[in-house]
């Protein structure tokens, strides 16, 4: 950890944490707030959104950036009984499709789409009067409204083209080994600047550190992918006053 080692004074090490399971999925769940044998519980990002509220009405307050092909990863951003409006929103760093299923259809004018959403909003109000106790309906309405607003705000938030070359190098984006995670952490910093309270940025799909043999070689490879991006993220956050 040659790069991260320079930042240890800005990191808190919690040495009292432990796990009662040797199963990876169970340890993931405990890391995010519950034991696998407990009833389903909201994860920590959902609790933060629920307890602290919203800083930016145009962006989700709990964001997931990474790969989630494994269903166990998806458990890390579920809000459970708090309601789906507090679940994490999965974003892609693909500028053409940053929000899955949230891109405006080609050929549809912005004014036309706005009129469509206003019409749907009126119908939703009628449904809300008819079913006042339907929490799922209210959450769905809010999610659609947020999705509409995010069509403009999310592409801007993940667009790193305006960042300086120095910043890109700080995160290791100029190197193939560190580029993927560097971009994800840079996007996480931009989310934080815009009022997103909690961002999960994963380096890979499930099992990155699950080395059962050749530990030195495989762990060294994994460390190399994240060392400089994490250090760059911490340094960038600190100089911008975002660690205060």
Language-model region placement:
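Ligand-binding pockets and gating/stacking loops
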Residues: 1-244
